[in-house]
């Protein structure tokens, strides 16, 4: 732009002396719009500017499809820069000025709407360049258009009153929502559902929306710092209004284009599918809770130990049968084969009682045998024959002493027997000697 050529690098270098960086570092010298730390501290942390973009098609004189630059091109650029700093209450061009410039209000609104999606200083620069291109083309005579199929979009008309429905500007959201400047109060732009990939325009006029969207590299600007701050506030207001539209439509979006591409049918389907699902989930949860409570009720009654058990009557009938079985003779019980074990508690109790009864019988027999043996032992001890109340310990002691005495007597008798046998042998030898003599 012409504002960039008139800048003096020496003055820029002098303005950057109070910065925090040393003199030998020319980190910010390449940025013509860099400000000292007193104005705005955030501008010191901006990224390095990229090289300027190539000139647009409107600026090329050799392009057969684009007219040459008019003589008052600088005036139109200055007018576009002033357009950005106007207050929202100002009526731009009084309703008929757009027709004189060859632009319809919807076209300008569409430019600003589609550029409001980009935040930062690059959005203002792209917007200013797009408006200047439109103004330069509007001042020249339009060339005859080439016939095109009905599906292709038609360029913007010269008159500001009539608005074509096939214009790409009509494929946007209502401009009054995000554009703060009041144009003609009586006119309103109708909107149509936007398509994902609109067909290219076949007329000589290049759509400004494509130019603004294809500009992905930041450009330099010739406006002052006051204009930049004012455009930042306008962009913030536009972004807040777009966020309010997102909240009203209740759609989760990632980008603004995705929200505009979505149709009203998808919105209604989302709200309809979500609400009955919640009601169905609530009803199903309540039904499941009722079923669980009904199933758990008998369990609580069974585990309530304080309440009377419903099986008490059947258990009380079992003890008389046990008594009858215990009264049967012992021989009969020995003859009857044992029943197989069952899982019922009543049969288990009966088997346990029968086992205990057999054990008691065997224990009683053992005790009787032991008593009888003690009585027999007492009878064999001479000292305890007449003592019927002798204790078992006394019987055992006396019996032990009596056994020891018997062993001593046996030894004595054995020695006497040996002596007698020797005596017998001597007598026999004596008899034989007498016979031989």
From Swiss-Prot:
Keywords: DNA-binding, Nucleus, Phosphoprotein, Proto-oncogene. This is N-myc protein. SUPFAM superfamilies: HLH, helix-loop-helix DNA-binding domain (SSF47459). It is found in: Nucleus. Residues 138-162, 188-267, 310-365 are annotated as: Disordered. Its main location: nucleus. Residues 151-162, 202-211 have a biased composition (Low complexity). May be involved in CNS maturation. PROSITE patterns: BHLH. InterPro entries: bHLH_dom, HLH_DNA-bd_sf, Myc_transcription_factors, Tscrpt_reg_Myc, Tscrpt_reg_Myc_N. One of its GO terms (molecular function) is RNA polymerase II cis-regulatory region sequence-specific DNA binding. Efficient DNA binding requires dimerization with another bHLH protein. Binds DNA as a heterodimer with MAX. The modification Phosphoserine is found at residues 231, 233. Residues 354-406 form the bHLH domain. One of its GO terms (cellular component) is nucleus. The keyword Nucleus applies. The keyword Nucleus applies. It comes from the Eukaryota. Residues 233-252 have a biased composition (Acidic residues).
